[in-house]
């Protein structure tokens, strides 16, 4: 099974239409990977589905980088 980091990066690449090797931990979804507000909503929804969790809106607003997404999932698993 893939690590959480690998799974998050795969989802980000698929949702934003970028290559997986462009998705590094420090990248901002908006500033570096070209996401708009709709992309970020869809990204959060994809993360919720993949990791079978619910991300409240106030938390979703804080998930602006690849690392923030990884950290959120890590802290809300199991």
Swiss-Prot record:
Keywords, ordered alphabetically: Cytoplasm, Fatty acid biosynthesis, Fatty acid metabolism, Lipid biosynthesis, Lipid metabolism, Phosphopantetheine, Phosphoprotein
Carrier domain boundaries: 2-77
GO BP term (any one): lipid A biosynthetic process
Post-translational modifications reported in the UniProt record: 4'-phosphopantetheine is transferred from CoA to a specific serine of apo-ACP by AcpS. This modification is essential for activity because fatty acids are bound in thioester linkage to the sulfhydryl of the prosthetic group.
Signal peptide start and end residues: none
Database matches in InterPro entries: ACP (IPR003231), ACP-like_sf (IPR036736), PP-bd_ACP (IPR009081), Ppantetheine_attach_site (IPR006162)
Record's keyword annotation contains Secreted: no
Location within or outside the cell: Cytoplasm
Name of one Pfam family that matches: PP-binding
GO cellular component: cytosol; membrane
Entry-annotated residues carrying O-(pantetheine 4'-phosphoryl)serine: 37
Domain of life: Bacteria
Pathway: Lipid metabolism; fatty acid biosynthesis
GO molecular function per UniProt: acyl binding; acyl carrier activity
Function: Carrier of the growing fatty acid chain in fatty acid biosynthesis.
Family in the record: Belongs to the acyl carrier protein (ACP) family.
PANTHER family assigned to the protein according to its UniProt record, in alphabetical order: ACYL CARRIER PROTEIN, CARRIER DOMAIN-CONTAINING PROTEIN
Protein name: Acyl carrier protein
Source species: Pseudomonas putida (strain W619)
Gene: acpP
